[in-house]
């Protein structure tokens, strides 16, 4: 049975959920009253034994045992174990519900795809849907206690009308040592193919859709069979059960109220009813009972699935849809809103308060001033920015600056390998001035000539063929005629790696600023090329070789 209380909690009001505590069927009281009575009986029996039977020495020994149990009882991770276990059981329970076979989609397809209002067509449709119901009954009979009690043998299925005598004999001839719940689905598939070959099903697309739905129902039945076969590991269930019961066995001794005259910590009061121990019993033991009830929803508990009702409903609805409702349509008539573009269904007096206007969006409730609705031109926007944004105190606070403002980059320096020792500042300054003179001296020199063409950025040509000149001599080029720039460049190529520092003063005009940026970028490229070329010839001073120039 299934306990339905949805209507009682439809509205969250005062006492709506509290009224559920008065229910008996499916309640925690019905599940726990037996264990609770046993626990209370044992608790007060131990209490009477401690108060009236034991001697003073025995009472002292019992008190030590009670303090020991109460101090170590919290080491049992009962909340941790129960939380994971109940979560696993509830997810498994819901998955089994989702795999319950409902033939509604299949009966709609059979009623519409299988044509013919004659005796043969009617027999074909009823037989197809009866095979589907028979497959569901066979699997539910295998996993549900209530269904098995209703149909204990296959002969009872014949008497109930789910199977004919010929089908019963055909099923017995198979002689398989396995469950035969899958046989009606095979009959359904073969009969559907026969109906297609006989012209009862027009198209292969319709046949494929019918087969897909049958395979879906067969898969759901297989899932239920697998859930019934593969249970939650027994060791997990045993661990949870032992943890809960051992916890409350320790509570029988550890939660006893000791003699308050002996000043034991936590035992200043001598109560008769252990209120919080009883509440803890209801919570933890009820938590375990939830898992015990949901671990197999095909039993006869109050919250188990109504499998017998499902069988009755599926048979009645399916036969009606494929037989009495086949091609039995009501006459088509114009609806009452035929000429209305926006129909307004009426409300009753009880539902008038639930009428609402259409939701247009959250921004439709925003109201703007009249001056905020005026359109601005670009010139007015720029003027307003200059007057109110850049010159105001708030604009300065927010860091708003005009477009023609440039950051005052003074004494912009690029220092490489230069010590910050005060004694060497003069040497660094002289070296920087000398480096700047060298840069301006070779400003017009094309330094890309020392780089092979296939290594230049943007060049896609391969390396040149090896020259016929020896390695010690440079190959002549068109740029090495007379006293050209190549002589000066050779001097640079023999220089060691230098430390270059550029002192750039940014001009105020934008044009000079751009030119200075290009000069800064070119100087940085010059330094990188000099460094790369110097590293590629580490022993040129000793060997006295000259670099090979490429065009």
Swiss-Prot record:
<feature type="compositionally biased region" description="Low complexity">
    <location>
        <begin position="476"/>
        <end position="488"/>
    </location>
</feature>
<feature type="transmembrane region" description="Helical">
    <location>
        <begin position="238"/>
        <end position="255"/>
    </location>
</feature>
<comment type="subunit">
    <text>Interacts with YWHAG; this interaction promotes the ligand-gated L-glutamate channel activity leading to the positive regulation of NMDA glutamate receptor activity through the L-glutamate secretion.</text>
</comment>
<feature type="binding site" description="in other chain">
    <location>
        <position position="10"/>
    </location>
    <ligand>
        <name>Ca(2+)</name>
    </ligand>
</feature>
<dbReference type="GO" id="GO:0034707">
    <property type="term" value="C:chloride channel complex"/>
</dbReference>
<feature type="topological domain" description="Extracellular">
    <location>
        <begin position="256"/>
        <end position="274"/>
    </location>
</feature>
<dbReference type="GO" id="GO:0050908">
    <property type="term" value="P:detection of light stimulus involved in visual perception"/>
</dbReference>
<feature type="binding site">
    <location>
        <position position="304"/>
    </location>
    <ligand>
        <name>Ca(2+)</name>
    </ligand>
</feature>
<feature type="compositionally biased region" description="Polar residues">
    <location>
        <begin position="465"/>
        <end position="475"/>
    </location>
</feature>
<dbReference type="GO" id="GO:0005229">
    <property type="term" value="F:intracellularly calcium-gated chloride channel activity"/>
</dbReference>
<feature type="topological domain" description="Cytoplasmic">
    <location>
        <begin position="1"/>
        <end position="31"/>
    </location>
</feature>
<keyword id="KW-0106">Calcium</keyword>
<comment type="function">
    <text>Ligand-gated anion channel that allows the movement of anions across cell membranes when activated by calcium (Ca2+). Allows the movement of chloride and hydrogencarbonate. Found in a partially open conformation leading to significantly smaller chloride movement. Upon F2R/PAR-1 activation, the sequestered calcium is released into the cytosol of astrocytes, leading to the (Ca2+)-dependent release of L-glutamate into the synaptic cleft that targets the neuronal postsynaptic GRIN2A/NMDAR receptor resulting in the synaptic plasticity regulation.</text>
</comment>
<feature type="topological domain" description="Extracellular">
    <location>
        <begin position="52"/>
        <end position="60"/>
    </location>
</feature>
<keyword id="KW-1133">Transmembrane helix</keyword>
<feature type="transmembrane region" description="Helical">
    <location>
        <begin position="61"/>
        <end position="82"/>
    </location>
</feature>
<feature type="binding site">
    <location>
        <position position="301"/>
    </location>
    <ligand>
        <name>Ca(2+)</name>
    </ligand>
</feature>
<feature type="binding site">
    <location>
        <position position="293"/>
    </location>
    <ligand>
        <name>Ca(2+)</name>
    </ligand>
</feature>
<keyword id="KW-0812">Transmembrane</keyword>
<dbReference type="GO" id="GO:0061534">
    <property type="term" value="P:gamma-aminobutyric acid secretion, neurotransmission"/>
</dbReference>
<feature type="region of interest" description="Disordered">
    <location>
        <begin position="459"/>
        <end position="489"/>
    </location>
</feature>
<keyword id="KW-0406">Ion transport</keyword>
<dbReference type="Pfam" id="PF01062">
    <property type="entry name" value="Bestrophin"/>
</dbReference>
<protein>
    <recommendedName>
        <fullName>Bestrophin-1</fullName>
    </recommendedName>
</protein>
<keyword id="KW-0869">Chloride channel</keyword>
<keyword id="KW-0472">Membrane</keyword>
<dbReference type="GO" id="GO:0051924">
    <property type="term" value="P:regulation of calcium ion transport"/>
</dbReference>
<dbReference type="GO" id="GO:0098857">
    <property type="term" value="C:membrane microdomain"/>
</dbReference>
<feature type="binding site">
    <location>
        <position position="296"/>
    </location>
    <ligand>
        <name>Ca(2+)</name>
    </ligand>
</feature>
<dbReference type="GO" id="GO:0016323">
    <property type="term" value="C:basolateral plasma membrane"/>
</dbReference>
<feature type="topological domain" description="Cytoplasmic">
    <location>
        <begin position="289"/>
        <end position="551"/>
    </location>
</feature>
<comment type="similarity">
    <text>Belongs to the anion channel-forming bestrophin (TC 1.A.46) family. Calcium-sensitive chloride channel subfamily.</text>
</comment>
<keyword id="KW-0407">Ion channel</keyword>
<keyword id="KW-0868">Chloride</keyword>
<dbReference type="GO" id="GO:0042802">
    <property type="term" value="F:identical protein binding"/>
</dbReference>
<dbReference type="InterPro" id="IPR021134">
    <property type="entry name" value="Bestrophin-like"/>
</dbReference>
<dbReference type="InterPro" id="IPR000615">
    <property type="entry name" value="Bestrophin"/>
</dbReference>
<dbReference type="GO" id="GO:0051259">
    <property type="term" value="P:protein complex oligomerization"/>
</dbReference>
<feature type="transmembrane region" description="Helical">
    <location>
        <begin position="275"/>
        <end position="288"/>
    </location>
</feature>
<feature type="transmembrane region" description="Helical">
    <location>
        <begin position="32"/>
        <end position="51"/>
    </location>
</feature>
<dbReference type="GO" id="GO:0098793">
    <property type="term" value="C:presynapse"/>
</dbReference>
<feature type="topological domain" description="Cytoplasmic">
    <location>
        <begin position="83"/>
        <end position="237"/>
    </location>
</feature>
């Amino acid at each position: 049975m299934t306990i339905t209380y949805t209507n009682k909690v439809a509205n969250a009001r005062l006492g709506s959920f509290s009224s559920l505590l008065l229910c008996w069927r499916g309640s925690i009281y019905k599940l726990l009253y037996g264990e609770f009575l046993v626990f209370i009986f044992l608790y007060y029996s131990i209490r009477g034994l401690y108060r009236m039977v034991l001697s003073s020495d025995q009472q002292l020994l019992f008190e030590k045992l009670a303090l020991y149990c109460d101090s170590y009882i919290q080491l049992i991770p009962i909340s941790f174990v129960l939380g994971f276990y109940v979560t696993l059981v509830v997810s498994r329970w819901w998955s089994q519900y989702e795999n319950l076979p409902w033939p509604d989609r299949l009966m709609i397809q059979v009623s519409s795809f299988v044509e013919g209002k004659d005796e043969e067509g009617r027999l074909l449709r009823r037989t197809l849907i009866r095979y589907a119901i028979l497959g569901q009954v066979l699997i539910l009979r295998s996993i549900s206690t209530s269904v098995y009690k209703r149909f204990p043998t296959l002969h009872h299925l014949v008497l109930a009308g789910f199977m004919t005598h010929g089908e019963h004999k055909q099923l017995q001839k198979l002689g398989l040592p396995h469950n035969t719940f899958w046989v009606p689905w095979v009959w359904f598939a073969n009969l559907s193919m026969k109906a297609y070959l006989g012209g009862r099903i027009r198209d292969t697309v319709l046949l494929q859709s019918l087969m897909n739905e049958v395979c879906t129902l067969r898969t759901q039945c297989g899932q239920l069979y697998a859930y019934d076969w593969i249970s939650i590991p027994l060791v997990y269930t045993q661990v949870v059960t032992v943890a809960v019961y051992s916890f409350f066995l320790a509570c029988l001794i550890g939660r006893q109220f000791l003699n308050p005259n002996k000043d034991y910590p936590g035992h200043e009061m001598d109560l008769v009813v252990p209120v919080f121990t009883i509440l803890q019993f209801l919570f933890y033991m009820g938590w375990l009972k939830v898992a015990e009830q949901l671990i197999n929803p095909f039993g006869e508990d109050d919250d188990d699935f109504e499998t017998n009702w499902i069988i009755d409903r599926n048979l009645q609805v399916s036969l009606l849809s494929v037989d009495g409702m086949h091609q039995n349509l009501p006459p088509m008539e114009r609806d009452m809103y035929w000429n209305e573009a926006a129909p307004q269904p009426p409300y009753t007096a009880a539902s008038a308060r639930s009428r609402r206007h259409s939701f247009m969006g959250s921004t439709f409730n925003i109201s703007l001033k009249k001056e905020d609705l005026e359109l601005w031109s670009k010139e007015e926007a720029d003027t307003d920015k200059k007057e109110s944004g850049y010159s105001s105190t708030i604009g300065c606070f927010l860091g708003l600056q005009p477009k023609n403002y440039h950051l005052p980059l003074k004494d912009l320096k690029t220092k490489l390998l230069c010590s910050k020792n005060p004694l060497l500042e003069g040497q660094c300054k002289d070296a920087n001035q000398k480096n700047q003179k060298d840069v301006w001296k070779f400003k017009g020199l094309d330094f890309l000539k020392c780089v092979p063409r296939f290594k230049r950025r943007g060049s896609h040509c391969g390396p040149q063929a090896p020259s016929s000149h020896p390695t010690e001599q440079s190959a002549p080029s068109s740029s090495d005629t007379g006293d050209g720039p190549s002589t000066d460049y050779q001097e640079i190529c023999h220089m060691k790696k230098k430390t270059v520092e550029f002192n750039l003063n940014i001009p105020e005009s934008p044009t000079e600023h751009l030119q200075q940026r290009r000069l800064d970028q070119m100087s940085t490229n010059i330094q990188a090329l000099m460094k790369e070329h110097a590293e590629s010839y580490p022993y040129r001073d000793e060997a006295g070789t000259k670099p090979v120039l490429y065009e």
